[in-house]
Amino acid sequence: MDIKLDPSRDDLPLMANTSHMLVKHYILDLDVDFGNQVIEGNIVLFFGDGNRFKNQSRSTQETFQMESEEADIFRTAEPCHVPEMDSSTFSPKMGHRECAVCGKGDQDAFDNDGNHDNQERDSEISSSKYCCDTGNHGKRDFLLVLDCCDLSVLKVEEVDVAAVPGLEKFTKAPKLLATPEKLRCEIVRDLVALPADAWREQLDCYTRCSQAPGCGELLIDSDNWSLRIRKTGTSTPADFPRAIRIWYKTKPEGQSVAWTTDQNGRPCVYTMGSPINNRALFPCQEPPVAMSTWQATVRAAASFVVLMSGENSAKPTPLREGYMSWHYYVTMPMPASTFAIAVGCWTEMKPKASPPDDLMTEHSLPLSPSEADLRYDNTCNHMEYPCRFQSASAASQDIIPYRVFAPVCLEGACQEALLWLIPSCLSAAHSVLGTHPFSRLDILIVPTNFPSLGMASPHIIFLSQSTLTGTSHLCGTRLCHEIAHSWFGLAIGARDWTEEWLSEGFATHLEDIFWAEAQQLPPHEALEQQELRACLRWHRLQDELRNSPEGMQVLRPNKEETGHVSASGASVVKHGLNPEKGFMQVHYLKGYFLLRFLTRTLGEKIYFPFLRKFVHLFHGQLILSQDFLQMLLENIPENKRLGLSVENIVRDWLECSGIPKALQEERKAEDCSPSRLARQVGSEVAKWIRVNRRPRKRKRGKREVAFEKLSPDQIVLLLEWLLEQKTLSPQTLHCLQQTYHLPEQDAEVRHRWCELVIKHKYTKAYNQVERFLLEDQAMGIYLYGELMVSEDARLQQLAHRCFELVKEHMDRASAQVVTEMLF
C-alpha cells in the first residue's frame, strides 16, 4: 500500500494489520497539560487473535514474513531518560500506577501529578537511531502495525501480566509447564475471553495487568500514518506479546483534538470529529472491524471537568492539591473512532422547570415496546458483552438518564432551547426503535470552532451553540438526528466507512420521524412537516450535485470491492482526507431520499416494524448496504415488493452519481402538486415579489400587505425562493427582516438571510453576516465563498477580517477550504 499520500487531498489509509491481531481492550492513563497543549501518559493494549489467524496453517503464516519485509529498519530500543521520583510527593490515592512501570531498571517516568518531566529529552521515533535485525536466523520478525499520526512515542514495552497476583481463578494458563512468554500470552487470551457476566472482574483484571511492570522494550518505527512494532525473534502473531504499553504524548498540532477556548474564554480541549479520527490522540487500530472495549483515567487541574464516551457517569477523585482524576470505561466493543473526550470548565445545566405535560405523554409509533420487542427472542448475534437488548428493564426505559454541560454563559440559552426538549426526543426515539443501545447520555455545548451542528459518540453528544438560537425547531431536529446515531452509526456501524449513508442517511430520515413524534403531531400534520422538509432537502441535494465532482456523489464508491481489505487488514477510505468532503451532504441527502422512497413504496406500517426488527437483530455489529436491503426484501411478501430487488436498488441509488430516476419522478410529481405548506410559501413569495416591484415612493394610505405567519422551515424555503430573484430592493430586504424578525431566527434561517444580504449588498445587515461568521462557524464556511465571488471590496474585506479572527482555532479542514476561497 502506498503510504506517501498527500495528507490534504487523498484517500485516508487504515494501516493496522487487523487480520493478524485485534485489540480487545485499551487502558489509557493520561494527563492533560493545557500549558503545553499536550496530552501525555501511556496506553496499554490487550490483544486477541486477528480476523483470519485462527484459520491459518503454518504455510500461510509465511505471509506475515512477506508483509514484514517493508520494515527492515527499526530503531534500537533505547531507554528513556527519566527523572528520579521524589518519594515525598507520592500520593497513595494515586494507586500503584505511580510506581515503577517503565520496565526493568527504569524508575517512574512520572512526577507527582502524573506528568512526564517537560525537560526530558523527547525520544521521538522520527529522530531515533536505526539498525537491522539479525537475531532471528534469517527469518523476518512479525510486524504489528497500529494507526498513528502526530504522536511522540517515547517507548513501547511488553507488559509482564504474569507478575500480577490473583489472576489464577480467571485463567487456565499452565504456570508450571509454560515458558514466561507463553504464560503471558495465555493469561491475556483467557482474560479477553471472559464471559459477559464477569465484566466487573474482567475490568479489574485489566486494570491490575496494566499496572504490572514491563518485561522488555520492543523495537519501533513509524511513518506518517502508522506505528510499527516488533519483538526480535518473534515471527508470527501467535508468539507476539498480547499486552504492550506505549508511552507517548500528543502534539499541539495533532488533528484528533482541538485546543481552544470556550464561550467564556476558558481553555478547553475536545475531539472534534477529525477525518483522521483518534490516531493523533492514541495509537490504535482504526479499521471498524477492530471493535474493542476501553478504560481511561484522565488527570487535569481541579477547575476542569472531564467528559468522555464512557458508560459510567464519572465522579472526580482528588489527587494532590489542585488536581482531579476521572475514570471512565465501556463494556460494549466498538471501533476506536467512537472514542470521545472533552475537557473544559463546563457547568452542568439542570432544568429549572418541568417540560410541558403534552411533551411528556407516552404514546407509540408504530408499536409499543411490549408489542414489538417481545416478537423477537432475546438472543443477540454480536460478540458477547453486557447487552441492554437482553434486559427487560432497559427495553421499557423510554428516557435514559441524561445530563447537559455548557459554559456558564450559555445557561439561559440551554434552559430556553434544549433542556426541556431532551425527554420528549429520547422518548420519541424509543417509541420508534425500541431499546436505547446506551445506558445514559451527556450533551455538551462545544466551542464556536466546532465544524458541524452536532456529533454523536457513545453516551455523549456534542452540539453546536448554533442550535440554541431562535425557536426550539433547529435544536429539536438536530438533537433527534444525533440521538438516531445511537442506533445507526454507533450500535450498528458500517463495515466499510465509504458507506457513510448507512449512518447519515438513516439519521437524517429518522430525525423527521422522531421530531414529529416528540412534538405530538397528528399524522396529517407530521406528514405535511415531513413533505416540507423533503422539499428543502431536494433543493439542497440539487445544489450539492451541481457543485461536486461525480466521484463524490456515489453512496457506494467501492462497488463490488466494498468491505474488502488487504491480506493484512489494511485499506483506504476513498476521499477520506479531502477537506471539502466534510462540508458535503450527498451521503446524508441521497441516503435520506432512498429511505424515504422505500418507506413510501412499502408503507410505514411495513417499514418501521421492519426497522425495529433490523435493529434488534443487527445491533452490536458492522453491516454493508446489502445486509439491510436483503433483510428488508426478505421480510416483504414477493407480491408486495413492487419490482424492488437488491440489485436494482444498488444500481440505481448506491452506485450511480447524480439523481436517481425514481427520485426525479417523485419530485416532478411533487412540483405538479406541491404540499399545502409549500403552496403557502409560494403565495408569500408572490406577495414579496409584488412588494419588490412597487415604486420606491408609495402614496400614503396605501394598504399594507398582510403576510402569513410561517414556520422556520417555511421561512427557509421562502428565502431560498427569493434568492432566485435577480434583484431585491433595500426597502424589500428591510421589510423582510422586520416581518420575520430574521436576526432572532435560528441559524438555518439566518444563513439564508445572510446569502440574501450578500447577493443584494444590503449594507445595513453586513454586521449580521459578520456575527454569523464568528458565532456560527459550524455553518459559515459557504458564506466565505459567497463573499468573495460578490466582487465587492467591502464584502471581501469582511471575509478576510472574520477569517483573521477565527482561523487560529478553526479546524484544519475548514481553514484550508476557506484559505482556498480567500487567496
Swiss-Prot record:
Names of the cofactor(s): Zn(2+)
Site feature Transition state stabilizer, where: 588
GO CC entries: cytoplasm; nucleolus
Main location: nucleus
Entry binding sites for Zn(2+): 481, 485, 504
Keywords in alphabetical order: Aminopeptidase, Cytoplasm, Hydrolase, Metal-binding, Metalloprotease, Nucleus, Protease, Zinc
Expression sites by tissue: Expressed in testis, heart, brain, lung, liver, skeletal muscle, kidney and ovary. Expressed in vascular tissues.
GO biological process, one term: proteolysis
Gene Ontology molecular function: any one: zinc ion binding
UniProt function note: Aminopeptidase which catalyzes the hydrolysis of amino acid residues from the N-terminus of peptide or protein substrates.
Family: Belongs to the peptidase M1 family.
Protein known as: Aminopeptidase O
